[in-house]
Amino acid sequence: MARQCEICGKKPMVGANVSHAHNVTKRRFNPNLQRVRAVRDGKPQTLYVCTNCIKSGFVVKAA
């Protein structure tokens, strides 16, 4: 499973951990993906969707 939203395509971003001593190490910010049973092309499917898409109503949940 790729860490990517199947609706909007949101992917991990690269950032930095910064300590109190200002030591910088790279880190990843992963999108908040949820497994949702949703209707796509008239059929129910299991999708990995970010919470922004769920809250915005881009996902129609299957019964």
Curated annotation (Swiss-Prot):
SUPFAM superfamilies associated with the record: L28p-like
Domain of life the protein comes from: Bacteria
GO molecular function (one): structural constituent of ribosome
Keywords: Ribonucleoprotein, Ribosomal protein
InterPro entries (alphabetical): Bacterial_rp_bL28 (IPR050096), Ribosomal_bL28 (IPR026569), Ribosomal_bL28/bL31-like_sf (IPR034704), Ribosomal_bL28_bact-type (IPR001383), Ribosomal_bL28_sf (IPR037147)
GO biological-process terms attached to the record: translation
CC annotations in GO: ribonucleoprotein complex; ribosome
Family: Belongs to the bacterial ribosomal protein bL28 family.
Protein name: Large ribosomal subunit protein bL28
Source organism (scientific name): Desulfosudis oleivorans (strain DSM 6200 / JCM 39069 / Hxd3) (Desulfococcus oleovorans)
